[in-house]
């Protein structure tokens, strides 16, 4: 087995949909093609939105599809915990390292205030933070704390971050202009996605991150955190998103594309084969097992643009 370690990192806020399945299939195929393994991590940072029953169902769905993981989830393993809701002490340690570098500051801005400020937005829809609370004095911070609990952000430099994406190719983002100072922790104490995934991927030995293209803009921020924390960054490959036939992005609200409904109509091999077809891994939508796709898998065959599902394919 090679040293490649990929991962499934779903957020169990509902049943999987086709987009989640496609990402999982590509992550699994990429790791297995290299003779590597797959870790399953449950990204349930917001535990109220992610009841354990969805995580259990998610494991059953992945197993049914033939996307068997080697470590993590309810199976456990040497790099637990594998549920982010159980990892607060681990994140706290990394957060303290960043705070000790003088890079963390409290932010009292509300979401509505940020959107009302007409600040530019990142490609994933977030506001590029204008630095409103970046240079508050200790007195100003103390006064604001009387009225509102702050979230916490990390300072970023005016610096370009360059990397070569395994699917999308060369990519550059400026941390200050394209991202802005970003959240590490919410006002309610929950740690932010950017910090949690960096800490978890590093401690689980993940060497390859495969995820949707909607997270491409997160990569520069995460590479910055890897550097600050002295951790080795993985390779990244961002796969094109699946769109409904009318061009809408798929979501867990699209019940017709959820695995619950798909399982009632198709076999696992039919679902895998049709996904392999739209992602350029085979010339026709014939039924396939995941194992049968390993040998010929190549990122060169995967499209670079978002994929509109053909009518009546599912």
For each feature predicted by the language model, list its residue ranges.
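Alpha-helix initiation and N-capping motif
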Residues: 55, 88, 111-114, 126, ...
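Active-site cores that bind ATP or allylic diphosphates and position pyrophosphate for catalysis
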Residues: 112-251, 258-262, 311-314
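Short, mixed-charge aromatic SLiMs
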Residues: 46-56, 244-246, 295-303
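Short, surface-exposed acidic
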Residues: 70-73, 233-236, 282-288
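Non-catalytic terminal extensions that flank enzyme cores
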Residues: 1-15, 38, 65, 142-143, ...
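Alpha-helix boundary recognition
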Residues: 96-100, 202, 263, 276
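N-terminal Rossmann-like or analogous alpha/beta NTP/dinucleotide-binding catalytic cores
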Residues: 1-118, 122, 213-214, 218-231, ...
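Short secondary-structure transition/capping segments
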Residues: 82-97, 121-127, 148-158, 278-293
């Amino acid at each position: 087995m090679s040293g490649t370690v990929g991962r499934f990192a779903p957020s169990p806020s509902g049943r999987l949909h086709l987009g989640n399945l496609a990402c999982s299939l590509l992550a699994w195929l990429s790791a297995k093609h290299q003779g590597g393994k797959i870790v399953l991590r449950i990204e349930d940072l917001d535990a109220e939105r992610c009841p354990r029953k969805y995580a259990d169902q998610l494991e059953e769905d992945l197993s049914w599809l033939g996307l068997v993981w080697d470590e993590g989830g309810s199976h456990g393993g040497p790099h637990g915990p594998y549920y982010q809701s159980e990892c607060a002490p681990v994140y706290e340690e990394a957060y303290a390292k960043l705070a000790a570098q003088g890079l963390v500051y409290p932010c009292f801005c509300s979401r509505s205030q940020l959107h009302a400020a007409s600040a530019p937005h990142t490609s994933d829809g977030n506001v590029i933070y204008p630095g409103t609370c970046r240079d508050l004095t200790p007195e100003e911070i103390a006064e604001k704390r009387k009225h509102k609990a702050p979230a916490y952000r990390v300072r970023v430099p005016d610096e370009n971050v360059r990397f070569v994406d395994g699917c999308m190719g060369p990519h550059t983002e400026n941390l200050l202009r394209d991202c802005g100072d970003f959240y590490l922790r919410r006002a309610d104490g929950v740690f932010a996605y950017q910090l949690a995934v960096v800490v978890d991927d590093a401690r689980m030995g993940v060497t390859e991150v495969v995820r949707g293209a909607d997270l491409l803009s997160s990569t520069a921020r995460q590479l910055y955190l890897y550097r600050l924390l002295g951790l080795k960054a993985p390779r990244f490959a961002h796969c094109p998103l699946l769109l409904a036939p009318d061009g809408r992005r798929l979501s867990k609200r699209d019940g017709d594309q959820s695995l619950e409904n798909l399982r009632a109509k198709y076999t696992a091999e039919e679902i895998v084969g049709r996904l392999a077809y739209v992602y350029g891994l085979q010339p026709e939508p014939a039924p396939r097992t995941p194992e049968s796709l390993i040998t010929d898998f190549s990122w060169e065959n995967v499209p670079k643009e978002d994929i509109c599902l053909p009518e009546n394919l599912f």
